[in-house]
């Protein structure tokens, strides 16, 4: 089916203010002459067309610019990927940008949607490294990438006790990806950013077991790792020329005779001890290892991404990623990038007093809040802050509440969204210019 854009109203026969009309084998999307609103209308129209069973389309006309093409693609995408889109001719640079968005967005959405039976912790680490290598190769930067994957008992031997503790209950070994993108080729080059991602490839909740309804989508609990991998790949596509390190903390949280238990105490590399009061608050336990490693690199800034708390989703739904940080300037930079890329982020509170709300009688901190009515997203961030020396500056925590949709909306199909890839790449690039 051919799809065109029009600034004229649809005939009332298609309904008042209809965004779609049809003529033979052609559909017309009716715009409102408002740039942001029109992008949304195009994405909504794409969803409507998919809902009508249309799988193959050709976008026709000079009105199709980069942003309209991208909006249509986002709405037309489904997890089964049983569709085809013929895009109009764009200028070379714009065509490259569109293809890079699709390449990186598809990686993120595809790997999040993938079943846990095929995406083990080690596989996630391998696939992420392979994706970055491929992206670097496309842009003649393959020699800039080096990495290692630490897995199984080697994690415990090297002091990554959080990842090991959470993942040791599964036959699929836990793993940590440590990847260095260094286009300068100078081993002593300063690090612009360290990216730390939660890569829980399946989360049963452990002995604090989830109900079936809550567990059914837990193959997506590696969404933070996927998002940061996609963002780094997209930044490379846009010409990133400074050093960035990626740390993915990968594990399965299952029940077995070897799984961790409530009351266990983890001693981290930096000497902090943490009592496990809920095995379903495992994401922060694995991220701690990554944050310690990231902090030791003395980067200009650190970003961690994780599908960390239900509290963040309760606050903002699936429509925004939640941002928590004490660094107002860095948050401002992030929101500027989000505005430029037309992606939704929302700030949630994180203050010093939250750090006193995760007390333990047996360790330095506990992995859940210790007050009767606590701010779950904020206390989770507070836990993470114990693994960054100067937690008040140059650190962004993103609770990935917009990573995945359990039900479709007028903009998105069921499944992963890819929201955030462009914003985080934009942030890295903008910081690299300062």
Swiss-Prot record:
Enzyme class of the recorded protein, top EC level: hydrolase
Catalytic reactions of this protein: Release of an N-terminal amino acid, Xaa, from a peptide or arylamide. Xaa is preferably Glu or Asp but may be other amino acids, including Leu, Met, His, Cys and Gln
InterPro entries per UniProt: Leucine_aapep/pepB (IPR011356), M17_PepB-like_N (IPR047620), Pept_M17_PepB (IPR008330), Peptidase_M17_C (IPR000819)
Cellular location(s): Cytoplasm
Record's cofactor remark: Binds 2 manganese ions per subunit.
Disulfide pairings: none
Predominant subcellular localization, coarse grouping: cytoplasm
Listed GO biological process terms: proteolysis
UniProt-listed Enzyme Commission number(s): 3.4.11.23
GO cellular component entries: cytoplasm
Binding positions (Mn(2+) 2): 198, 203, 221, 282
Molecular functions (GO terms): manganese ion binding; metalloaminopeptidase activity
Essential cofactor(s): Mn(2+)
Active site residues of this protein: 210, 284
Keyword rRNA-binding on entry: no
Keywords carried by this UniProt record: Aminopeptidase, Cytoplasm, Hydrolase, Manganese, Metal-binding, Protease
Pfam families associated with the record: DUF3663, Peptidase_M17
Residues annotated for Mn(2+) 1 binding in this entry: 203, 280, 282
Function comment: Probably plays an important role in intracellular peptide degradation.
Family note: Belongs to the peptidase M17 family.
Complex formation: Homohexamer.
Name of this protein: Peptidase B
Species of origin: Haemophilus influenzae (strain 86-028NP)
Lineage: Bacteria, Pseudomonadati, Pseudomonadota, Gammaproteobacteria, Pasteurellales
Gene field: pepB
């Amino acid at each position: 089916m051919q799809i065109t854009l029009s600034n004229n109203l649809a005939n009332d026969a298609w309904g008042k203010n209809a965004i779609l009309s049809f003529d033979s084998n052609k559909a017309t999307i009716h715009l409102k002459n408002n740039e942001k609103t029109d992008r949304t209308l195009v994405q909504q129209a794409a969803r409507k067309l998919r809902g009508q069973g249309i799988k193959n389309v050709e976008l026709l006309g000079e009105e199709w610019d980069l942003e309209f093409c991208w909006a249509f693609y986002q709405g037309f995408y489904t997890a089964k990927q049983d569709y085809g889109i013929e895009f109009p001719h764009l200028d070379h640079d714009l065509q490259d940008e569109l293809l890079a968005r699709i390449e990186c967005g598809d990686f993120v959405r595809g790997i999040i949607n993938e079943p846990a039976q095929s995406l083990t912790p080690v596989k996630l680490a391998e696939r992420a490294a392979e994706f970055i290598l491929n992206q670097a190769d496309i842009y003649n930067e393959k020699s800039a990438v080096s990495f290692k994957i630490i897995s199984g008992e080697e994690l415990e031997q090297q002091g990554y006790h959080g990842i090991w503790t959470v993942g040791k209950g599964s036959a699929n070994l836990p793993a940590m990806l440590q990847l260095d993108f260094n286009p300068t080729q100078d081993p002593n080059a300063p690090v612009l950013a360290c990216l730390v991602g939660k890569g829980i490839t399946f989360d049963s909740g452990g002995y604090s077991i989830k109900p079936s309804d809550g567990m059914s989508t837990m193959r997506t609990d590696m969404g933070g790792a996927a998002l940061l991998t996609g963002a780094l790949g997209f930044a490379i596509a846009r010409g990133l020329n400074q050093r960035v390190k990626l740390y993915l903390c990968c594990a399965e949280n299952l029940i077995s005779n070897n799984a961790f238990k409530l009351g266990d105490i983890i001693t981290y590399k930096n000497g902090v001890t943490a009592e496990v009061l809920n095995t379903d608050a495992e994401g922060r336990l694995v991220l701690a290892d990554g944050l310690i490693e990231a902090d030791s690199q003395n980067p200009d800034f650190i970003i961690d991404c994780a599908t960390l708390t239900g509290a963040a989703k309760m606050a903002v739904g699936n429509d925004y990623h939640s941002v928590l940080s004490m660094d107002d300037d860095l948050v401002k930079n992030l929101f500027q990038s989000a505005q430029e890329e037309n992606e939704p982020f929302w700030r949630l509170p994180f203050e010093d007093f939250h750090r006193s709300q995760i007390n333990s009688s047996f360790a330095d901190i506990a992995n859940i809040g210790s007050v009767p009515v606590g701010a779950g997203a904020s206390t989770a961030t507070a836990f993470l802050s114990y693994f960054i020396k100067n937690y008040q500056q140059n650190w962004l925590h993103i609770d990935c509440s917009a990573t995945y949709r359990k039900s479709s909306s007028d903009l998105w199909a069921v499944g992963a969204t890819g929201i955030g890839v462009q914003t985080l790449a934009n942030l890295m690039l903008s910081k690299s210019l300062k």
